Amino acid sequence: MAESLPTEFDVVIIGTGLPESILAAACSRTGQRVLHIDSRSYYGGNWASFSFSGLLSWVKEYQQDSDIEEESTVSRQGLIPETEEAIALRKKDETIQHIEVFCYASQDQDTEDNVEEIGALQRNPSSVASTTITELDSACLPEERQSYFTDYEMPANHTQKSDKEISLGITDVEESLEKEKDCGDNTCIHTILGGHKDEDKHTVEDNTGQAKKNRITFSHIVKEGRRFNIDLVSKLLYSQGLLIDLLIKSNVSRYAEFKNVTRILAFREGKVEQVPCSRADVFNSKELTMVEKRMLMKFLTFCLDYEQHPDEYQGFRQCSFSEYLKTKKLTPNLQHFILHSIAMTESSCTIIDGLKATKKFLQCLGRFGNTPFLFPVYGQGEIPQCFCRMCAVFGGIYCLRHKIQCFVVDKESGRCKAIIDHFGQRINAKYFIVEDSYLSEETCSNVHYKQISRAVLITDQSVLKADSDQQISILLVPPAEPGACAVRVTELCSSTMTCMKDTYLVHLTCSSSKTAREDLESVVNKLFTPYAETETNKEEPTKPRLLWALYFNMRDSSGISRSSYNGLPSNVYVCSGPDGGLGNEHAVKQAETLFQEIFPSEEFCPPPPNPEDIIFDGDDKQPEVPGTNNIIMATIDSSEESKNLESPEKHLPH
Amino acid sequence: MSMEDYDFLFKIVLIGNAGVGKTCLVRRFTQGLFPPGQGATIGVDFMIKTVEINGEKVKLQIWDTAGQERFRSITQSYYRSANALILTYDITCEESFRCLPEWLREIEQYASNKVITVLVGNKIDLAERREVSQQRAEEFSEAQDMYYLETSAKESDNVEKLFLDLACRLISEARQNTLVNNVSSPLPGEGKSISYLTCCNFN
């Protein structure tokens, strides 16, 4: 590294997940000197999203983790005086388990390239060694820029969709992605296949004689790997939720763009159907009878201000929400919709929780669109980075790939004084915020974690075909047997910039009872069919076909109370990893709570000055003597119009 | 929606090693200032300058790295939706030139393929300390299919030219695009920024 880190800060933050990133922005916004570091080569920790090759590298990293030798750490001797002691941090991340990868898409086209691929893999170590840039980044990068423009034939049916791009929000020039979609690069493939012999055994063999038309092969996916932004956590933003409010309030929203979730789906009697949820949807629904429409509207209207009508539910306090719905003269159809798709609760949930959830759903409807949810373009992984950008704009210093050995604690006061990094450098600060996966086994010996089961699928069709193939859908699949967990399914189309054209990215999430595959495979089989199987079948497949699947378990540390950690100094604050919930409320609440604990008198993420309103001291005079001031002082000229920040929206249709 | 008094708005993003003069280029162009000895850029997210080109108002939104380049930790979202990238090195610093391929890799991965990239060798006022010859840079930029220009933020050499040429190119690209996709109005439900303005209410 060309430069070494400064050594004096107010706040050191370890981990770049969502709560840590929000905190970083909040602290830096109040003028604190913030150092924000992550041992990984990417932002977001378990909140990250990856390109396809990036995800494969991530898988590989976890699979190899066990045989990586302990890094030789620089001795701490001499760095810590007698009056201080060290609390070691964990060296390896242990939050991910039971990773399983299945490739259903044909790999036949790849065989000829294989020799070259392995060779290409050999090439990599030297280039990695010579640069601090991570192998994750370089893995899917072209060697030569020109090769980018080599022609690559795509299935024939994609051309008419080229106008589907995202409006940039800040420009009226539509940025066409048409070209990008057609460009492939051979180097992409190489690193990946070489490293993935493990998965190859799962590969379902494909008949080479099949018609190639319209087929998506594994090499297509690899070539278009950059088109994927695959989130490790699957979440959505409630349009009246805490995260949206914070994004807007702090103006961090200017770094991201969002799309509305377009459909709420239900899975009932083996069939996927669309749930009508807005007033217009209900009235336009073809599935519902006139009577049902009235019943549903009546019930939903009641839920919006259920607190005002306690007599409607007081008598049922002992019932579960599902039992209560039965008493409301709702048809089974409607009961299912409300319970699983609108309230999105388990059958056993209490009546008040059910009403609360229904009300929240209804309140979020219509703020930005027809469903209560938004999804960030390029994936959820963008969000922590947006907060990091805000932190950096206010002077926060960023350093990825930076490992920390330990906290240094003053024996007398019991307070943490510093951290020591993998170079043996001591970095002093007043407050320390750490993501819990960095805490050592010793610190966490009394902690019991929950687990989240996750699946990531690449499929060739939507679970429910519609006029437009660009749908973002959420579906809750109720448990097959009582006591099991409902599975949340999110299906993303290519215009969310999370998957390549003609594919869908499907995320499954539930709280774990077994390994992710054991928890989720039955739902995957209900909704999808493996790619190869249907190829021999002459009939038009009714289910979308699976091209690729990944299962893993992620640790859910969201419920852990601070007191369960052993021996942490009082000025070390702990953030948890992602929770299994649909929204981001937990992370935002945690960040705000910790911020207020640390800086009780400061405002949490106030709006920054409008860039267009900033005038610089010295604008009208010659700059000061060199070296007198290293900081550009910004002041706000309030006389200027203050609406310009909103200019991006001005190009949007309403 | 028609209140904005510009015909085009473009997002231009600067990248390159720390200390090559990115912020100086932006400040020179947007404010006509050259701040010596200036280190970090606090609280400034992007700078705006509206220029007129052939009678059309072009608003340039110019984004700086916010210091995240110092330890090679630029967020991906920084590159998203940029219309143009200015890849900057310091002609008196070989190292800043040698790092260009690394920056190009980041561009490849995170920026749109449509992005226009300009290579800028800054600090030509320090010609006596030059370490990177013009010819090398030209060859490199040609090989990478980039425009190339040498500037001095201090002497204000080529700074206007850099941004104005870029604006011209962006306009002609934009024109071509609107011709190609004649229906340029975004479809409902396409990516949007959120703010209080975009809200509508239930019912």
UniProtKB/Swiss-Prot annotation, chain B:
Give the EC class as a word.
Answer: hydrolase
Chief location category: membrane
Q: Which Gene Ontology terms describe the biological processes this protein takes part in? A: Golgi organization; Rab protein signal transduction; vesicle-mediated transport
Could you tell me which residues carry Cysteine methyl ester?
A: 200
At which positions is GTP bound? Answer: 20-24, 41, 67, 122-123, 125, 153-154
Membrane topology, as annotated: Lipid-anchor
**Key words, A-Z:** Cytoplasm, Cytoplasmic vesicle, Golgi apparatus, GTP-binding, Hydrolase, Lipoprotein, Lysosome, Magnesium, Membrane, Metal-binding, Methylation, Nucleotide-binding, Prenylation
State the residue spans of region: Switch-I: 36-44
Give its localization: Membrane; Golgi apparatus, trans-Golgi network membrane; Golgi apparatus, cis-Golgi network membrane; Golgi apparatus membrane
* CDD domains hit by this protein: Rab30
* UniProt note on regulation of activity: Regulated by guanine nucleotide exchange factors (GEFs) which promote the exchange of bound GDP for free GTP. Regulated by GTPase activating proteins (GAPs) which increase the GTP hydrolysis activity. Inhibited by GDP dissociation inhibitors (GDIs).
Prosequence residues removed at maturation? 201-203
Q: Which cofactor does it need?
A: Mg(2+)
Can you cite an annotated GO cellular component? cis-Golgi network
Q: Which Pfam families match?
A: Ras
> What would be an example GO MF term here?
GTPase activity
Q: Relate the protein's function as given in its record.
A: The small GTPases Rab are key regulators of intracellular membrane trafficking, from the formation of transport vesicles to their fusion with membranes. Rabs cycle between an inactive GDP-bound form and an active GTP-bound form that is able to recruit to membranes different sets of downstream effectors directly responsible for vesicle formation, movement, tethering and fusion. RAB30 is required for maintaining the structural integrity of the Golgi apparatus, possibly by mediating interactions with cytoplasmic scaffolding proteins.
Comment on protein domains:
Switch I, switch II and the interswitch regions are characteristic of Rab GTPases and mediate the interactions with Rab downstream effectors. The switch regions undergo conformational changes upon nucleotide binding which drive interaction with specific sets of effector proteins, with most effectors only binding to GTP-bound Rab.
State the name under which the record lists this protein.
Ras-related protein Rab-30
Q: What is the lineage of its organism?
A: Eukaryota, Metazoa, Chordata, Craniata, Vertebrata
Q: Which gene encodes it?
A: RAB30
